[in-house]
A protein has these predicted regions:
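The C-terminal output helix
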Residues: 117-134
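Conserved acidic segment of CheY-like receiver
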Residues: 1-12, 17-18, 49
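Alpha4 helix (beta4-alpha4-beta5 surface) of REC/receiver domains from two-component response regulators
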Residues: 62, 83-102
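Conserved phosphotransfer microenvironments
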Residues: 51-69
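Acidic, metal-coordinating helix/loop segments flanking the phosphotransfer/catalytic sites
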Residues: 32-48
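His-Asp phosphorelay/catalytic-motif detector in bacterial-type signaling
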Residues: 47, 72-80
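C-terminal output helix
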Residues: 107-116
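Two-component signal transduction core modules
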Residues: 49, 102-103
């Protein structure tokens, strides 16, 4: 069973992700503030962290960078990172944050499930940043 942490300010985003992953053998945890992500990753060790670009006080890009730095220093376990972008042009920011994959909102449930499976099946050092096609 995989553990997925979803960080998004908007309840509709968290609900959309939870609904998309409901049929899979996945535990979905939620936080609404960017500053809470690091603690949740340290406590629960999720295999995948799904970050919305809009997280109350700390956006998805900043959280992704923080998680990479903390994992590199050995303070939190490594997790795959999926960024949920607001628009196609945000791919530039996602690359700067070294996200493992990106999806452009609105999220298609099937695409989200496939992307999650690809990320969880990938070797830890393999980058799949362009594995998930963007949604129009």
């Amino acid at each position: 069973m995989a553990t997925v942490l979803v960080a998004a300010y908007g309840k509709w985003v968290r609900d959309q992700v939870r609904t998309a992953l409901a049929a899979s053998d996945t535990t979905v945890l939620e936080v609404t503030r960017g500053q809470d992500v690091r603690g949740a990753v340290a406590e629960f060790g999720p295999e995948l962290v799904i970050l919305d670009m809009q997280i109350a006080n700390m956006g998805g890009v900043a959280v992704a960078i923080d998680l990479h730095l903390e994992a590199g220093a050995g303070r939190v376990p490594e997790s795959k990172i999926l960024l949920l972008l607001d628009r196609e042009h945000d791919r530039f920011l996602a690359k700067r944050a070294d996200a493992d994959a990106v999806l452009v909102k609105p999220i298609d449930a099937g695409t989200l499930r496939r992307t999650m499976k690809q990320l969880l099946a990938a070797a830890p050092s393999a980058s799949t940043a362009d594995a998930a096609p963007a949604q129009a």
